[in-house]
């Protein structure tokens, strides 16, 4: 099942399934995070991020070919950083380039598979880790490269946490439709041209490994969103470098999830 969060004509925030681009069927959610289709179809007025995350945890340099294109060594352990929950944006929302990241241009795209945690996870083994996953979604780890590097090492939070810098959606595909998250095609198109075209099998650390590793230090709370790294093809490694500008259209497409689309705007 693919779950969508949205607002109705009455302004209510609800969850649905079987979204056809205009309407969706309302779903009921139980305490154990199972969903049932009510069969009642309503108009989708505004698509919302499919999750309201308690935390957004990100993993850097997690695709082998991406590490190679940046000239960096593959990490021995997952490289962890955070994005502020306030950076979340939905399908169709504008990604706004802040004034401080406009001159010179520096804002980049990063297609990523997002993982939504279902239940509290602490000291979870790799073998049981996927039992703690509710579903998967498309995300875009938008990054202001100059600000990302100010603190050095992997202290990237500020450059990746500006408002709207974490587009997410349009739906969350539940685990019953994605039994193997390491077997998904992932792409990003910029103004219709494919910039990233890869596969989750190129990940250095698997989804199960990441969840197990993260749960050893802190309890992963329900609703935690994990961004699992971006593949090769980002803008700053290109010659000449390619950065986002107002009017650009980004599309993140992940197999069996859908297409997350966002336009780029400039902060006034």
Predicted regions located by residue number:
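Catalytic-pocket segment enriched in acidic/His residues
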Residues: 37-50, 66, 98, 145-268
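N-terminal non-catalytic cap/leader segment that marks the start of a structured domain
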Residues: 1-79, 251
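Structural signature of FAD isoalloxazine-binding scaffolds in flavoprotein oxidoreductases
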Residues: 74-91, 107-109, 245-256
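Short helix-loop capping/hinge motifs at secondary-structure junctions, enriched
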Residues: 121-125, 177-180
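Short beta-strand segments
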Residues: 7, 58-62, 82-83, 108-118, ...
């Amino acid at each position: 099942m693919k779950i969508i969060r949205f607002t109705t004509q009455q302004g209510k925030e609800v969850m649905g399934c079987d979204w056809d681009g205009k309407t969706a069927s309302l779903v009921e959610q139980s305490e154990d995070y199972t969903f049932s289709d009510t069969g009642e179809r309503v108009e989708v007025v505004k698509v919302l991020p499919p999750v309201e995350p308690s935390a957004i945890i990100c993993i850097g340099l997690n695709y082998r070919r991406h590490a190679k294109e940046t000239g960096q060594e593959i990490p021995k352990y997952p490289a962890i950083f955070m994005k502020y929950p306030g950076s979340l944006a939905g399908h169709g929302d504008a990604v706004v380039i802040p004034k401080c990241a406009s001159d010179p241009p520096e804002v980049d795209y990063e297609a990523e598979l997002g993982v939504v945690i279902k239940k509290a996870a602490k000291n979870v083994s790799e073998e049981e880790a996927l039992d703690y996953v509710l579903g998967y979604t498309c995300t875009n780890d938008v990054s202001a490269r100059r600000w990302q590097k100010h603190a050095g090492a992997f202290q990237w939070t500020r450059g990746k946490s500006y408002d709207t810098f974490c587009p997410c959606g349009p739906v969350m595909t539940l685990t019953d439709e994605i039994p193997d998250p390491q077997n998904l095609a992932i792409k990003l198109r910029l103004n219709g041209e494919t910039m990233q075209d890869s596969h989750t099998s190129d990940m250095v650390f698997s989804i199960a490994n990441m969840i197990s590793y993260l749960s050893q230090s802190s309890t992963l709370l329900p609703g935690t969103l994990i961004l699992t790294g971006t593949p090769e093809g980002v803008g700053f490694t290109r010659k000449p470098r390619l950065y986002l500008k107002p009017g650009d259209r980004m599309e993140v497409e992940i197999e069996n999830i859908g297409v997350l689309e966002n336009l780029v705007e400039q902060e006034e």
